[in-house]
Every structure is written in C-alpha cells, then in structure tokens.
Amino acid sequence: MSVFHLALNAHILIGTVVLVSFWTAALAAKGSTLHRRGGKTYVIAMAGLLAVTLVTAVGMVLDGDPRRAMFNVYVTLTSVVSVWMAWSSVAWRHDIRRYLGWPYKLLFGALAGYGLFVLSLAPRMPQPARVAMVTAFAVLGLSIAAAMAWRLWKRDDSPRWWLAEHLTAMAINFAATHASFSILAGSSVLEALKDPWMRTAVLVAWMISALGLRLWAGRRFLSPKAAARATTLGAARAGAAG
C-alpha cells in the first residue's frame, strides 16, 4: 500500500474522532466540563489529522502529483488557521494583543497570499469541475483571511470579541470537518462522490451551511440578552465556587 493510501486510511480513522468530538462540544452546555473536554479532544485530534494530511501531500508528490499536493497543503492551512483561532480566542480572551500577536498575523498573511495564488490557478485547471472546486476553496480561504483582517482592524470592539472569533472559527471547522468526512469517507462507499462536480457541490453545500450556522450562532450567543445571561450564569458559578 502506498504512502498516500496509508495516510488516507489514517485520515478517515482520525476524522471519525474529530467528528464525534466536534458534536460532543457542540451539543454540550457551553462552558461546561463536557464542552471543554470535547473541545480539547477536537483540537488534539485535528492536530493529528492535519499532520496526517501533510503526509498525504508527501504521498501525492511521490505518486507524481505535485499540483494536488500543493492544493492539499492549502486546504491544511485553512484548517490550521481555524483551529488556532478557535483555541487561542478562548485561551487569550482577556488579552487581545496576545491573540492578535505574530502567530495570528503570520497565519493571516500566509492564508491571504496562498488563497490568491490558488485563485490564480483556477482558470488553468483542465476540467470545468476542477475550476469550480479550486475557486470554491480559494474563496473559502480568502473569506477567512478577510475576517482576520477585520479583527486586526476592529480589535476588541466589544467585550465578547473573543466569542465572535470562536464562533467564526468553529463555523469554519464545521464546514471543514463535515466536507472532508463526506468526501473522503463517503467516496469509499458511494462512487458518485468521486465525481468532481459532486465533490464541488458537497463542498459548497457545507460552506453555505457554515455561513448559516455562524449567523444563527451570532444571534444566539452574541445578542445583548445572551450577554446578560452569560454574566448572570458566571456570577452564579462564582458564588457557588465561593
């Protein structure tokens, strides 16, 4: 079995852990022990998954497909950015300067530059379906970079800026986790998911779903009423702990 296929099988296996931990954190009460443990498991599993993805890229190069490997690295970068944002926005929620430090700026610059490069490659793809897929991924990365630029400009424009960042990152992770699992694991069962147009449709569907999820989460958790509830709950927990 080639390096590529070994890494692909590992990707599907770890991806299952990623999917389960994502929904464990998503469905748990926010801020609860289960929520935090699910989130921690998700970050650790994603770190392993992204490492495997880079091995997959090496396998692609060894199989004589460097263009696909380069694209694979770009997809990995978008996930690295979103996982970093999801973790660091909570870890440094009281320190916007640390959150927007050099790692954030480095990831922003890398994603913006790589996204523009990938977008420039789209018209050169040999098939219309691949043009559409590469364009969709480029737009995804550039949209994330635009959100990062907005945060660099606005900084801590509200007391719950960190939650806005966390929700944005988790919406991106939602799309990445489910699109990857649908395409990679699904294509091993359904032959239709190997078709480039079908894969593009799946990707775009999850991207649109992620946008809808982020808009809903913003209304659910960032409204003045939600902030008041969080303050009351925090005070109650502090009182119970005291």
Residue ranges of each PLM-predicted region?
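Alpha-helical membrane insertion/targeting regions
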Residues: 1-242
